[in-house]
């Protein structure tokens, strides 16, 4: 379900490599070769994908797209003592306790707080319906940080989760409407977000839809 975002991230790396194919270290020029492996957005396969990269004797890891798979692979990189740099993975657990994992993006506690303040100050929300994928570290973590910040601001949050590979969000959107929510917060993958937006429009739901960095 994170395939589209993962492809965008890889394309960005490939573009950067095409623009700057070499690096100078200690007065010597080295060619930079990219090795790409696919973890298929699976926490289980993330570990084998990480091991695959290590077997290729890579010098550094970039990624992965998706917090859950990054958390799953982090110990593998630490044990191999290979540095990893997260580009878009925002869950704090990825780098916590791991001296070999770094990141160039912001964290979910920051993102959740900013989004909650936006809902309160700009959208004038008093009640927010939060919807994310069940068992997804990114969705669940960010909804939790959002909820904490929102409640401190005096907002009420209704939180629900949908199963993986769900394609019908009608009942969830109906619940949001019946609960009297002012805003829907859905920090989901791109593929789910598209379905939620389309089905909300089809149901005539015109409340603001708030999303995250994905």
Identify the role of each PLM range:
Residues 77, 142-214:
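Extracellular/periplasmic bilobed ligand-binding domains
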Residues 4-11, 19, 23-95, 104, ...:
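Beta-alpha junction/loop-to-helix N-cap segments that form part of ligand/metal-binding clefts
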Residues 1, 40, 133-135:
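Residue-level signal for short, function-critical loop segments
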Residues 19, 23, 52, 117-122, ...:
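A generic secondary-structure signal
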């Amino acid at each position: 379900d994170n395939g589209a975002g993962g492809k965008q991230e890889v394309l960005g790396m490939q573009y950067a490599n095409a623009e700057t194919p070499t690096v100078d270290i200690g007065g010597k020029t080295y060619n930079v070769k990219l090795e790409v492996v696919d973890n298929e957005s699976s926490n289980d396969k993330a570990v084998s994908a990480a091991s695959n990269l290590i077997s290729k004797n890579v010098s550094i890891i970039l990624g992965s797209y998706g917090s859950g798979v990054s958390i799953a692979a982090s110990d593998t990189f630490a044990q191999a003592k290979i540095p990893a740099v997260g580009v878009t993975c925002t869950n704090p657990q990825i780098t916590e306790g791991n001296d070999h994992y770094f990141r160039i993006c912001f964290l979910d506690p920051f993102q959740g707080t900013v989004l909650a303040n936006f809902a309160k100050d700009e959208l004038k929300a008093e009640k927010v319906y939060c919807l994310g994928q069940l068992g997804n570290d990114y969705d669940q973590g960010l909804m939790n940080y959002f909820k904490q910040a929102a409640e401190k601001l005096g907002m009420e949050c209704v939180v629900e989760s949908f199963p993986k590979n769900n394609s019908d969000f009608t009942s969830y959107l109906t619940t949001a409407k019946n609960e009297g929510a002012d805003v829907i917060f859905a920090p989901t993958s791109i593929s789910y977000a598209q379905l939620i937006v389309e089905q909300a429009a089809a149901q005539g739901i015109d409340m603001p839809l708030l999303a995250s960095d994905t």
